[in-house]
């Protein structure tokens, strides 16, 4: 990658102090890069990913027609995973870890994570519940209420952060199902890296795609992990997209452009 391109992918100095502050209170850091669609095929080949070994998933989001939850930094998502498993997630992004209740921090279902992308980062709080793939499908198809897919803790977290007009069970159950989006998730363990790689290919109904490569690490390993990932990708000529955005942001941009 040319030096000028590297400059665009560095986190601005003004944000470094904030990042260091957030890292101290985070549970984990996920270093990510998004690859432009024109380079997907070459990237998958160069990093050694076998598409046949990828795990298929279906991802659903739940929001209002105007995406009011997303605009308030709140996301409700459910996933169906190959083999009959699934999960539901209520995520707040961005979040200041210092403002999170200690009771919530002690829950093994709640995590503070930093997504670090070229040029920036975002800190999020995620409340997760495991469920079956059928439970996800039933809620997505309206056979069961969305609230039945969430735990009491998730419902409380939702109510605390949703807009007042939405933050109760009645309005929660009236949210639209957005999706599904089809996802292929692959895991790699290159010999050149101390940590494994996760590769996710998100396929949108209009034919567009989002390819993200990431590695997860402990907060005190973040800068080392980022440098190692960039070195690994540079050595293989992987092109980094000029506009970096999270998978959720890409999905919501799609849904905003294709409102019912």
Name what the model sees in each region.
Residues 2-260:
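Phosphate-end processing signature that detects enzymes handling 5′-triphosphorylated RNA
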